[in-house]
Amino acid sequence: MIHTQERGTEAWWMETGAEEWADAIVAAMKLGGVDNLFFVSGSELSFYQEAIAKAQTKGRPAPHLVTMTHEHVALNAALGNAMVRNQPAATAVHVDVGTLHYGAAIHTAWRGGYPVLMMAGTGPRAFPGSMRGARGGGVQWVQEPRDQGEIVRQYTKLDHRLEHQDNPGLMISRLL
């Protein structure tokens, strides 16, 4: 039996402060039962590190950041964590190739029914110089697949790409 958080409404993640999207994402993960985020760093993922450090400083809920060296190892660690602890775990990996590196562990997660939130980075979509966080370097133009979710879609209950109009805390709480 998988441990789930019982809540009266989906807005329970709003019990904590959030100045940035990342603050809401890490709070929603922790409040949804995720104690560990198995993390493979990438240029588009530094916000996880910043948000978790900020949460720890301000006494807000956030999962423990477990730095990993490879995406396949990260997903397998999350699977083991979910199996042993009987609660959800999460991974965050580099855009495109990082998602591909999850490999056959995606099949294991799906067929075993293990509660793992798999997140991948994405390049900025705003034109360079148009706003904070807009595209900058050339690599951001070539590492973005047309549909990154397609890589894992057959082996997941749900996939969602956060867009500017989304409420990130609400989306993470729904995904969990």
Predicted segment positions?
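N-terminal alpha/beta PP-like core and its mobile active-site loop of ThDP/TPP-dependent enzymes
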Residues: I2-L176
